[in-house]
């Protein structure tokens, strides 16, 4: 898979996620809150996603790998802390209800699902770090393979979630 195709392949997880959620408990509620929790989560981790470009540019600088790694770890932990704070405090309820316009019952589903995605910001920063280091080293095959594995893993988790039928789709899709 060419490196240029990996973002497109990554986008395949969206319809796979929607199809999976539609087959799990609270399917309508999960699909109703998905855009809100996905959008808010992306807003928090988007800087981490863009960090890849910084890593590619500076990976060859003296001492850069250690500095970039430390920065990714600190920034990722900060992003996950913000995410977790939103998930477990009244801030999240306020955002889901008043900014997102969700009903109280949908806001509760959103808050539960959002909590399960608290690790995604730090993972985005670390993934950008590792991807940037691989691109800088011109070892991009692993990136394409990882994206394919991500899609297969996503499909597997969603099929398993639908078969087990014990957890709302919005939560399973965030795992």
What are these regions (language model features)?
Residues 25-28, 62, 136-137, 163-164:
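Helix-loop interface residues and adjacent transmembrane-helix termini in multi-pass membrane transporters
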Residues 38-41, 75, 146-153, 173-174:
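Transmembrane alpha-helical core residues of multi-pass small-molecule transporters
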Residues 103-130:
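Alpha-helical transmembrane segments of multi-pass membrane proteins
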